[in-house]
C-alpha cells in the first residue's frame, strides 16, 4: 500500500488501471535485473487477498473491508513469475494498526487477550502463546492457496515503544516461538517456500563498533542470526539504512554469520530523496559494490525511489546488474538436481528452443551464452535469461555465440548444462534436397556419423515452428499424424546443435 496502488479499484476500468500500474512497476524491476519482489500482503491485520481470518485492506478499493473486485496477490504472483521474478508475501507480524481500525477491531472481536494497546495503536502480544499460532494461521493460508516463493516477516520483534518487562533472553524466546510456529506450519506444505524476515540492520554491538542502543538482538529481541543457524529461516533482509562505519562493519558481520543461508541487506534508498536525508548516490553505489564483494545481495527500500530513478539509482543499477542473477539455491533444504533439458536448437528469428522435462514439480530454465565452447555456466556473466517458465527464448542476432540451458527446480538447484555442439560436426550429402515421403513414412537421409550418435529428429513447418520430435530409430520416420503440407527435417545433436537434412511434402 506504500508504493502501489496509486488509484482505487472500484469499477472494471479502475481495476484494469490498478493492474496496469503494477505491471509498469514490475516491467521496470525486471529490466533492472531484480529477481525477488517483496509484496506487502498482510498490512495491519488486513490483507490484499480474500482471507478467512482478516478483512481486506483499504489500499486497493479505498474502503477497508471491501473487495477490490480481484485477487491482487494472485495477479501479482502471475505477473512476477511471467517475468522470471520470485514473489514473497510480505507479512507485517506484530503491529495491527489503529486500535479502532478495521484490522484491530476484527481481532478484538476474535481474541482480545492477544492484543496490547500502546497509545492509539494495537499490537499482537508476542508473550501470549496464541499469537504464534495466529500468525502461523495467516502464513499457512497464504502458502496453501498461493504459489508464493516466500513468506517475508516484517516487524517480527518487540515494538520500540513497548515497555519490555521480561529478560532479553525470555523476549528472544517469545519472538523465536512465533518464527518456529510459522516455519513448522509452512515447511511441511511447501518446503521450497523461503521463510525470511527483515531484522534491525545491526545484529548486535561489535567488538570495535557500537550499535548505539539500536540493534536486533538486545533491543528488540530478534535472534535473527540464530534463526539462520537453527534452520528456522532461509533468508534475511537486514534493514541496513545506514552509511559508513554504521554500515560496512555490520554488513560484514551479517556475511560472517550467515550459516550458509541467504543474506540480502536492505538499502535505504529513500534517503536519496531531498525530502529525506538527501544522500548522494555514491553512498548507495559504494554499499552495493562492497556487498557484492562479500557475496551478499541487496534489496531496495522503497521501490518508488528506485523506479523514480532518484539521484540516478535506477540508471546505476542497470549498469551494476549488467546480466541477470540467480537467487542462491536452497541446498540446505534439497540438493537433488533436476534432469537436464534436451533438444536445444537455434531456429529462425534467433529463437532458442529446447524440450521441457516431464516432471511432477515446477521446473524453470536458465539460458547461458558465450563466444567460446562449452559455455561456462559457473560464470554469472554468461547468464542471459533466468527462471524462464517456457521452452523458448529470443537471443541476440549473433552467429558466433554458443548457448547452454539448465533446468532449475523450486529450490533453485540447477541441472547439468545442455550445451550446443561445436559447429559443423555433422554433414549430410545435400541439406537442400527433397526427401522421399509417401504421406505416412518419411525416408531418412543417410549420414554415417548420425548412426554413431544419439540424435533427435526435428520436423518444423515452413515458418520454423516445431511440429514433431523423435529419436532416430531405423531408416524411416512416422509422419502419419502430421497434416498435409511442406516441412523441414533437422537433426539435433546431444548438445543441441541443429543440422538441416532437407525438406519434404506430405500429400494424401
Predicted regions, residues:
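Beta-strand-rich modules
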Residues: 395-414
Amino acid at each position: 500500500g506504500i508504493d502501489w496502488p496509486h488509484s482505487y479499484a472500484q469499477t472494471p476500468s479502475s481495476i484494469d488501471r490498478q493492474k496496469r500500474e503494477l505491471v509498469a512497476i514490475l516491467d521496470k524491476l525486471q529490466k533492472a535485473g531484480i529477481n525477488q519482489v517483496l509484496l506487502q500482503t498482510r498490512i495491519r491485520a488486513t490483507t490484499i487477498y480474500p482471507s478467512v481470518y482478516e478483512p481486506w485492506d483499504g489500499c486497493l478499493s479505498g474502503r477497508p473491508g471491501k473487495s477490490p473486485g480481484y485477487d491482487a496477490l494472485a495477479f501479482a504472483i502471475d505477473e512476477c513469475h511471467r517475468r522470471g521474478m520470485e514473489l514473497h508475501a510480505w507479512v507485517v507480524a506484530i503491529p495491527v494498526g489503529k486500535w479502532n481500525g478495521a484490522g484491530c477491531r476484527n481481532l478484538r472481536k476474535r481474541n482480545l487477550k492477544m492484543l496490547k494497546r500502546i497509545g492509539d495503536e494495537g499490537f499482537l502480544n508476542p508473550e501470549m502463546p496464541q499469537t504464534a499460532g495466529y500468525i502461523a494461521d495467516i502464513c499457512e493460508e497464504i502458502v496453501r492457496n498461493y504459489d508464493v516463493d516466500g513468506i517475508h516477516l516484517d516487524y517480527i520483534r518487540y515494538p520500540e515503544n513497548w515497555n519490555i518487562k521480561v529478560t532479553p533472553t525470555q523476549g528472544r524466546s517469545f519472538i523465536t516461538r512465533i518464527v518456529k510456529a510459522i516455519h513448522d506450519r509452512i515447511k511441511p506444505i511447501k518446503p521450497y517456500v523461503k521463510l525470511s524476515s527483515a531484522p534491525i540492520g545491526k545484529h548486535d554491538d561489535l567488538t570495535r563498533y557500537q550499535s548505539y542502543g539500536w540493534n536486533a538482538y538486545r533491543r528488540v529481541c530478534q535472534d535473527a542470526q540464530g534463526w539462520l543457524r537453527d534452520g528456522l529461516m532461509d533468508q534475511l533482509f537486514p534493514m541496513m539504512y545506514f552509511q559508513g562505519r554504521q554500515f560496512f562493519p555490520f554488513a560484514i558481520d551479517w556475511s560472517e554469520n550467515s550459516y550458509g543461508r541467504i543474506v540480502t541487506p536492505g538499502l535505504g534508498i529513500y534517503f536519496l530523496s531531498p525530502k529525506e536525508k538527501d544522500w548522494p548516490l555514491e553512498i548507495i553505489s559504494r554499499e552495493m559494490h562492497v556487498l557484492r564483494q562479500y557475496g551478499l545481495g541487496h534489496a531496495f527500500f522503497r521501490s518508488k525511489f528506485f523506479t523514480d530513478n532518484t539521484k540516478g539509482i535506477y540508471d546505476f543499477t542497470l549498469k551494476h546488474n549488467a546480466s541477470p542473477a540467480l537467487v542462491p539455491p536452497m541446498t540446505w533444504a534439497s540438493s537433488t538436481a533436476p534432469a537436464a533439458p534436451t533438444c536445444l536448437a537455434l531456429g529462425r528469428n534467433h529463437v532458442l528452443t529446447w524440450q521441457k522435462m516431464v516432471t511432477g514439480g515446477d521446473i524453470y530454465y536458465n539460458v547461458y551464452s558465450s563466444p567460446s565452447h562449452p559455455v561456462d555456466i559457473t560464470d554469472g556473466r554468461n547468464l542471459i535469461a533466468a527462471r524462464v517458465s517456457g521452452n523458448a527464448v529470443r537471443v541476440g542476432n549473433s552467429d558466433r555465440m554458443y548457448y547452454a540451458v539448465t533446468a532449475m527446480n523450486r529450490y533453485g538447484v540447477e541441472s547439468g548444462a545442455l550445451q550446443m555442439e561445436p559447429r559443423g560436426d555433422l554433414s549430410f550429402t545435400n541439406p537442400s534436397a527433397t526427401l522421399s515421403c509417401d504421406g505416412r513414412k518419411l525416408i531418412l537421409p543417410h549420414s554415417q556419423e548420425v548412426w554413431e550418435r544419439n540424435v533427435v529428429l526435428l520436423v518444423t513447418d515452413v515458418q520454423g515452428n516445431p511440429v514433431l520430435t523423435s529419436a532416430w530409430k531405423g531408416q524411416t520416420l512416422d509422419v502419419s499424424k502430421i497434416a498435409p503440407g511442406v516441412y523441414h527435417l533437422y537433426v539435433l545433436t546431444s548438445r543441441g546443435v541443429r543440422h538441416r537434412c532437407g525438406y519434404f511434402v506430405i500429400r494424401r
